[in-house]
C-alpha cells in the first residue's frame, strides 16, 4: 500500500529520524491492561494511547486517538487519558459506534455470497455506487445506481477489480499490487517452499494465490487474508478472510475470526507458513510492530519447546527509509534490494521509465538474503562478497565491506563520516555529517527531547523525573498567573461598576438640585 510523492519527504524524515517526525507525538505502547482503550466512532476497534511532547518544556499528557487515521478529518476521536466522561456522553458514543458498523454481519455476507453464486449469469449484478453484490430482491433499491451486470465467477475471484480502491493515504492507502509484482512474490514463496501465506493487507496477493490454487496450475499454496476493508466480507468464506485492523490487532468478528487465524498459523505445528504484509506507508511503525509480534506469539503457541527459537518468516513491504525503525523492533530483519514498484492504481509506482528507480518500496524479511533469488532480467546481480542479490547500480564498497546503496543509485563513500552516502549529499563541516547542499544547519536534530543526547529517547532519559518536576512547577506558576489575572480583571470590572454607579447618582442629585 503505497503513498503519494508529496508524502515521501515527510515520511522519509520520520523514518530516518530517531522519533515520530517532529510533531512531538509518540505512541505509548505499554498502556494499563486494566483500563481498556475506548472505541473510535467509525468502529475501527480500540484506539491507541499517544503522548504529546514539546522538548521537555511542558508536562506530557496522554490521550486516545484513532489507531488507523492520522488525520483528524478522517476520524476526529480525541479523549484525554484522565478525562472522565458522563454516562450520557458514553451512551451517545456507543449509539454512534453502532450506527457506523457495516450494514451486514459476517454471517449475512457469507449467506448472500452462497446465494449469489447459485444465480444464473444474467441475474448476477454488482452495485458500483454501494460497492455491494446484489440479490434479486435488492434490485429495486438500487435501480437508480450504477450497476454492473453479468458478474462472472472469474470476476468474483478478483474482487479487488470490482471494488473501488480506498485511496486515503493516511488510513487505507489501498494501492494494489499489479499482477506482475504478485507473480514475482508467489513464485518466490513457492521456490522457498512455503505452503501457507498469511496475507495482512495484501488482497491482490491473496487473490492470485487462490487463482493459482483453483486454476489447475502447479501450486500447493493456500492463503488467508486479514484486511481492514470490510467489503471483502461479501466475496469470501470465513476461512479465507478476516476483517482485521493491523494497527491494534483487532478482529472485528471476535473470537471466531481469531480462531480462524490461529488455526491457519498453527497448522502442521506452524511449519510451512509465512506472513506477507503491505501496511499503509503513513502508518506508525511502533503499533504495527506490536501487532506483528502478537501474530508471531500466536504462531509460536502451536510450536513445541524444542522449536522455541524459531521465528515466523515474514515479508514486510515498506519504504527503505524506515529500515532503522523496523530493525529496532526486529533485529533479525534485513532489507532486500528488490524494488517493489508495480501498483495498479498508483501514478508513480509502475514499471517503466517513471517507475522502478523512483520507488522507495522494499521487502524487509527475517529470511537469510542468500536464499532469496532476485530476477537477473530486471537488473539484479549476485554479490559474492555480501552473499546476496543486489541491484546493478549498488556497487560493493571496499571500505564499508558491503553493497551500501538503499535507493538503487550508486552511493559514494565519505571518509569523514566513515560510511557511504547518497550521491547528492556533501559533507557539511558545520553539522559534521553529510547532507543535501541546501540543507539548514539549524534544523531539528535526532535524539532526546529533554537533554539533547543522541544515544537515547525522551522516555529513557535519566533527567525525565527532574524535567517533570520543573514542568510541573512551571505549569503551577502559569496557573497562578492566570488566576491572578482573572481576579484582577474581575476586581477591575467591579470597581468600574461601582465608580459608574457613584457618577450616576451624583448626576441625578445635581439634576434634582437644578430643577428645584
Swiss-Prot record:
A zinc finger (CCHC-type) spans 446-463. Zn(2+) 5 binds at residues 414, 417, 427, 434. Keywords: Cytoplasm, Metal-binding, Methyltransferase, Nucleus, S-adenosyl-L-methionine, Transferase, Zinc, Zinc-finger. Zn(2+) 2 binds at residues 127, 130, 142, 145. Transmembrane segments: none annotated. A zinc finger (GRF-type) spans 40-84. Residues 339-360 are annotated as: Regulatory loop. Residues 472-516 are annotated as: Disordered. Residues 490-499 have a biased composition (Polar residues). It is found in: Cytoplasm; Nucleus, Nucleolus. It catalyses: adenosine(4220) in 28S rRNA + S-adenosyl-L-methionine = N(6)-methyladenosine(4220) in 28S rRNA + S-adenosyl-L-homocysteine + H(+). Its main location: cytoplasm. GO terms for molecular function: nucleic acid binding; rRNA (adenine-N6-)-methyltransferase activity; S-adenosyl-L-methionine binding; zinc ion binding. The regulatory loop blocks the catalytic center by bridging the methyltransferase domain and the C-terminal CCHC-type zinc finger, resulting in an autoinhibitory conformation. Belongs to the ZCCHC4 family. rRNA N6-methyltransferase that specifically methylates the adenine in position 4220 of 28S rRNA. N6-methylation of adenine(4220) in 28S rRNA is required for translation. This is rRNA N(6)-adenosine-methyltransferase ZCCHC4. It comes from Bos taurus (Bovine).
